[in-house]
Amino acid sequence: MTATADLWPLFPDHIKQLQTRAERLFKRENLDLVAIHSGQQKRWFLDDMNYPFRANPHFKAWCPETQLANAWVILKPNTRPTLVLLSSPDFWHTTASLEGAPWLEEFHVEHISSPEAIEKLLPYDKKSAAYLGEHIEVAKALGFENINPDPVLHFFHYHRLFKTDYEIACLTQANHIAAEGHVAAADAFFNGASEFDCLLKYMAATRQGQNEVPYNHIIGQNENASVLHHWMPDKKASGSLKSMLVDAGAEVCGYAADISRTWSKQHNEYEELIAALDQITLALIDKMKPGVEFPALHQLAHEQIANVLFAFGFVSCSPEQMIEDGITTVFLPHGLGHPLGLQVHDVGAAQADERGTPIAPPSGHLTLKTTRTVEPRQVYTIEPGIYFIEPLLQKLANSRNKHLINWRRVDEFKPFGGVRIEDNIVVYRERNDNLTRQTALDAYVKKVTRLA
């Protein structure tokens, strides 16, 4: 758990708001108890080693310490939430220390000596109780019948998008930490470092290891910048460094930052393309307001990308035809963005209401997973990109639209891989708060980039 002391004055109201939501759920679903299981360690196959522990995100919403296996949050109507902690002696492993943690004051705390001992804190009759967690076998052994019921999950997932002040503060701190990593990785790149060495610089600057961050670091140089999730960093430095795309974050009390930046080794046309994407990012953020449907933003992104593809001479037809024929999806094959919070791709992104009514993506954009209408106090990423992805380009070269592409021009940019710019945005009623542009990263970009 990475946090500063100024978070904790915000925590009581956060718990109060979560409890208020839960009270509505208890009445609606006729529940007397919801037991949220943090999870438990999992062994490697045929081994005595464990995978890194990842807590149930529903547990993380209540508990800021994310490294608590076999812990529980028990919710009851009109009752202070109970935090159950496993307190058995363990000389094999280091366990998280909660001594003196100020946020514990918001809970009634119980200690159990073994994972099985949770049974004594649960009612015998569980017909009006629900289990939320990954371990179905644990729930069944404890006698739960309502295991991850859809009405409960849909309710919590829908409301997860509306952030409390505490949650926004966590996301803000995570952005500042991640920004330090991005600056360190960029410095290493400009000094000729490999992808792997840039990764090491990133981790050193953020003080967060690979098992602490919300998702695997993506650091791709040259052609590797065209791989959307390049998770195998090259340990050998390239003899001809051209570009680097970094998509990496940080975590504070379970809340994620998710930032992408792209760098050019030289001041050239590729850097101009980066600058064009940066302007598109800011323009789209300016259009993201309460009442706007996210698919409309996604469509606008493709219109802007089409303009850039035409302006840079990659495609010769009109922007309208590019979109109609699906050419822009070759260069931008992913969604414009997603909700951000306890999960990098946070849940509830395609729900119309708390009952879970789905909102389908628009025709031709099936990869768009965020289809909700934007509302105040929601947090989204905005991450347009232009990529030169060999399999997609090959498919385009074999299509009826191949004559519309300036293949010589495309070949000039393929060695750079691609470009992605990604910011984290809090939406308010009258304004947007760009958490990423308030960090040290913004000043660094302006210092090292000619076109910033």
From Swiss-Prot:
Q: Please indicate if the UniProt record lists Protease as a keyword.
A: yes
Query: Per its UniProt entry, which superkingdom is the organism in?
Result: Bacteria
Which amino acid positions bind Mn(2+) 2, per UniProt? D247, D258, E422
Protein EC:
3.4.13.9
Q: Which GO terms describe its molecular function?
A: aminopeptidase activity; metal ion binding; metalloexopeptidase activity; phosphoric triester hydrolase activity; proline dipeptidase activity
- One GO cellular component term, please give it: cytosol
Q: Which residues bind Mn(2+) 1?
A: D258, H338, E383, E422
Q: Quickly give the catalysed reaction.
A: Xaa-L-Pro dipeptide + H2O = an L-alpha-amino acid + L-proline
Q: Which family does it belong to?
A: Belongs to the peptidase M24B family. Bacterial-type prolidase subfamily.
Q: What is this protein called?
A: Xaa-Pro dipeptidase 1
What species is given as this protein's source? Idiomarina loihiensis (strain ATCC BAA-735 / DSM 15497 / L2-TR)
